[in-house]
Amino acid sequence: MTESRSTFAQQLGAAKVESTLLVLFIPSVDRDSQPIDQDTWVHRALETLGELFGGATAFPQGQGVWRDDTQGGRLVFDEPVVINCYTSETLLEAQAPRLRQFLVDMGEQTRQGAIGLVIDRDYLEISFPLREASDG
């Protein structure tokens, strides 16, 4: 924490100061544009981030698009929910295995081509192989 941020936190009487921003995108469709149970995954994400990092905030659906290069560059239009979570780099590193497990579970169970997240200014993407619908 910088000195000016520390001073500002003291002036406000802040009991907690976190400076690492984690942004998670919860999809509304799978890679074949079929709807998923987004509400369940938003709840699971909030629960996971709350347990791991102390809290998170979900924002209403937006509009997005993702290019699925595995399917010839097909565009998948989506209405993602964006979740913000402030934490510390130390806690993020300590909880990385549990966060990754949640992201992989969501990606696999909702048949995503990828799950994207942002940590501070870095966009990260976990990719999933193209599977046939019957591979369940």
Q: Where is each model-derived feature located?
A:
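Positively charged, small/polar-rich N-terminal and surface patches that mediate targeting and assembly
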Residues: 2-136
